[in-house]
């Protein structure tokens, strides 16, 4: 089973059920493959705040793809080489941090899409192999197959969200609620369900809906997933690798003590 059997764009177009994916911070292709076989729909590799480097990510993307799931990559920064590199390695989607203006969103799309939508540099034979396509077929379909999300996580991004959402070639908006809540509270704290955070997220979701974009967010827990889903979010990260390990170990110890 290979990645080309999973049409991420078509799946995200069906917004009746949320697309839930795990979030990886640890560099392990073995663990990535195992997570991809859990009853969730995708795996995101965090190259911004995780400990995953690009050389790690290549094998991890392959492991996720071989399990028939889409590999999503949060790149380190909004830089053409980093975005193109992730897509060349076979990522089905990239999440780009700190996109704070229309101009930055346009630059992101140029990095992620081939002409006429952008100016992505050609190359990356791993992507052809991942999708099981000839180079010619990949070129024809890459702009549609690969998804690019702009992260909304600052006051500046929120102020410009309607302009960002209208950028041609953008596939979705992805809220970083921790950074956004820090920004909105002026550094007081992190609260992913505070009123000011949720009000801001409603604005982001409305901008996404107006432009037929996917609304995504880092949720983390079942309760927060339900809250965000009620506001129109359908692309959400829920299971973090470190949290899964801690929960599994804690459950085992508790079970032993309860016997």
Feature roles, as predicted:
Residues 1-259:
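Expand to "…catalyze enediolate/carbanion chemistry for C-C bond making/breaking, isomerization
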